[in-house]
Amino acid sequence: GNLNDISARALNILKNVSFVACEDTRQTIKIMESYNFSNHLISFNKHNSKNRIPKIIQSLKSGQSVALVSDAGMPGICDPGEDLIRTARSNELSIICIPGPCAGITALVSSGFPSSKFIFEGFLPKKNIEREEILLEIMKSPKTSILYESPYRLKKLLNELKSICGGERKIKVFRELTKRYEEHIGDTIDEVITFFENKEIKGEITIIIGGFEKEETNDIDEINLKKELHLLVKAGLSLSSASKYLA
């Protein structure tokens, strides 16, 4: 993220807690060096969280305080901090959240899409069945949807979204939010696919998908028809055979 986004309250916490649990100690050291202070750091990430959580809980029970820091964004959103917080709550330990940057909310506000009702999906599952179920829900949902994705998998996801939601579905893709090379891309899925064609994608990606806008019509419900077509093709029918079946 951007070092200037950290609050005075967050800096005060980092200075005065017993120790700091951070996703990458090297990144947290940069923050401390920038503001001329230090503290005891331990690594806490997806690779060591199962072993670290019991030790951190024991430290908290003994009266120590700990600050949880992620590499970017809000700790506990799409990272192992969620498991630590849940375990601390189950042990009736005090949790205080210090407000800070969150890519999903930053992108949502910047998108211009309706923000009073939205769905946060984070990173989609890798298993095809679970993934398709969520994409089908996004396809028919009137609410704005928020996704995170790796730059290496973005093109695959965009093609999946086009297949299920259609190329004209409203979308905004945000790259490197709050950083020097921040980008806001697109208006439709087709536009975003064209933009990234033949490009090497780098950086952190946040995707905002506009809700489905149902047209007033007496014809067959297009969403249900498209869903049925998708399921028939998935079941093994060719696209032409499935189309004839539904005709």
Located regions from the model:
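Glycine-rich, flexible N-terminal cofactor/catalytic loop recognition
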Residues: 1-46
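A short, charged helix-loop
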Residues: 118-140, 215
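General beta-strand structural signal in soluble alpha/beta enzymes
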Residues: 22, 97-100, 147, 173
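A contiguous loop/helix-start segment that scaffolds small-molecule binding in enzyme catalytic cores
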Residues: 144, 151-247
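Short phosphate-binding loop-to-helix
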Residues: 46-61, 80
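Short active-site oxyanion
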Residues: 14-20, 92-96, 143-145
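Short glycine-cluster motifs
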Residues: 61-121
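Conserved helicase motor
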Residues: 44-50, 124-127
